[in-house]
C-alpha cells in the first residue's frame, strides 16, 4: 500500500470515529449488548426506517423478552404488534422460525460462532456482522447499501462501481474496521452515511474528508 492510499484510509477511519463521537444519532437499541435484542432488532429494521422501529421498540421487548416468548405467541398476534413497521406477516413468520431454531439448536441463546449465526434462518452477512460486532465485540464490517455508497464515493477508482457482493469491496471494508473500535466505526459510518454522505444531496461542505474524496473531486471539476 503506497503512502497516499494509506493516508486516505487513515483519514477515512479517523473521520468516521470523530463523527461518532460528536454527531451520532441515538436509538434505544444502541444502549444494549444483548445478543437477543440486537438480532431481533436487526430483523425489525429491515426495509423500514429506524424511526418506525423506535416507536414499537420498548413495547415489543417488554412483551417479548426472549425467544421463548416469540415462539409461544401466535404469528397473527406478533404481526399485529409490529404492524406499524410494515411487512408484519412476513416478519412475524421470520421471527417465529428464528426463535424455533435458536431454541431447538442452541438452547434459546444466540450462538457466538460466525458460521452458526449465518446459518440461522433469515440471517445474512450484514445481520451476522451486526451481531458479531454489536453484541460480541468482534471485529466485523457491517456492510450495507449505505456503507457501499460511502466507499464507492470516497475511494473511487476501482472501487467506484463495486456492488454489495463484490469480494474486493468486502475485503476493503474489513481492513478499514479498527481493532477495538468496531462498534464505534460501524455505527459512526451508518450515521455519517445518513447525515453527511446521503444518497441525494450529500453535504460535502460539512465532510471532514472531502479533500481526499474522489466523488467530491469529480463534482468540483
From Swiss-Prot:
Which keywords does this Swiss-Prot/TrEMBL entry list? 4Fe-4S, DNA damage, DNA repair, Glycosidase, Hydrolase, Iron, Iron-sulfur, Metal-binding, Plasmid
Mutation effect (residue 126 to S): Almost no activity
Task: Indicate which residues the UniProt annotation says bind [4Fe-4S] cluster.
Answer: 197, 204, 207, 213
Q: What residues does the HhH domain cover?
A: 105-133
> What GO molecular function annotation could you give as one example from this UniProt entry?
purine-specific mismatch base pair DNA N-glycosylase activity
Classification via SMART domains: ENDO3c, FES
**Alphabetical list of PROSITE patterns matching this protein:** ENDONUCLEASE_III_1, ENDONUCLEASE_III_2
- Provide the effect of residue 47 to A: 15-fold lower activity
Reactions the enzyme catalyzes: Hydrolyzes mismatched double-stranded DNA and polynucleotides, releasing free thymine
Q: What is the effect of changing residue 42 to S?
A: 25-fold lower activity
Looking up CDD domains in the UniProt record yields: ENDO3c
Q: Which cofactor does it need?
A: [4Fe-4S] cluster
- Please state the Enzyme Commission number of this protein: 3.2.2.-, 3.2.2.29
Q: Give the co-factor note.
A: Binds 1 [4Fe-4S] cluster. The cluster has a structural role.
- Name the family the entry cites: Belongs to the Nth/MutY family.
Function summary: DNA glycosylase that excises thymine from T/G mismatches and uracil from U/G mismatches. Acts as a repair enzyme able to counteract the mutagenic effect of spontaneous hydrolytic deamination of DNA 5-methylcytosine (5-meC) residues that leads to the formation of T/G mismatches. May also repair U/G mismatches arising from hydrolytic deamination of DNA cytosine residues. G/G, A/G, T/C and U/C are minor substrates.
In Swiss-Prot or TrEMBL terms, this protein is called Thymine/uracil-DNA glycosylase
Q: Which gene encodes it?
A: mig
Amino acid at each position: 500500500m503506497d503512502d497516499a492510499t494509506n493516508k486516505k484510509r487513515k483519514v477515512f477511519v479517523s473521520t468516521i470515529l470523530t463523527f461518532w463521537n460528536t454527531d451520532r444519532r441515538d436509538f434505544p437499541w444502541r444502549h444494549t449488548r444483548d445478543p437477543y435484542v440486537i438480532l431481533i432488532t436487526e430483523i425489525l429494521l429491515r426495509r423500514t426506517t429506524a424511526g418506525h422501529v423506535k416507536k414499537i421498540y420498548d413495547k415489543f421487548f417488554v412483551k417479548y423478552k426472549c425467544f421463548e416468548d416469540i415462539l409461544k405467541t401466535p404469528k397473527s398476534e406478533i404481526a399485529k404488534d409490529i404492524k406499524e413497521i410494515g411487512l408484519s406477516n412476513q416478519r412475524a413468520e421470520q421471527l417465529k422460525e428464528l426463535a424455533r431454531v435458536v431454541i431447538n439448536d442452541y438452547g434459546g441463546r444466540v450462538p457466538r460462532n460466525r458460521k452458526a449465526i449465518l446459518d440461522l434462518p433469515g440471517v445474512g452477512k450484514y445481520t451476522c456482522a451486526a451481531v458479531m460486532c454489536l453484541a460480541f465485540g468482534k471485529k466485523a464490517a457491517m456492510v450495507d447499501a449505505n456503507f457501499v455508497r460511502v466507499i464507492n464515493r470516497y475511494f473511487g477508482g476501482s472501487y467506484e462501481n463495486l456492488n454489495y457482493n463484490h469480494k474486493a469491496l468486502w475485503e476493503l471494508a474489513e481492513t478499514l474496521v479498527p481493532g477495538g473500535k468496531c462498534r464505534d466505526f460501524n455505527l459512526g459510518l451508518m450515521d455519517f452515511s445518513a447525515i453527511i454522505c446521503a444518497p441525494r444531496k450529500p453535504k460535502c461542505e460539512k465532510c471532514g474528508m472531502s479533500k481526499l474524496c474522489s466523488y467530491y473531486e469529480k463534482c468540483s471539476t
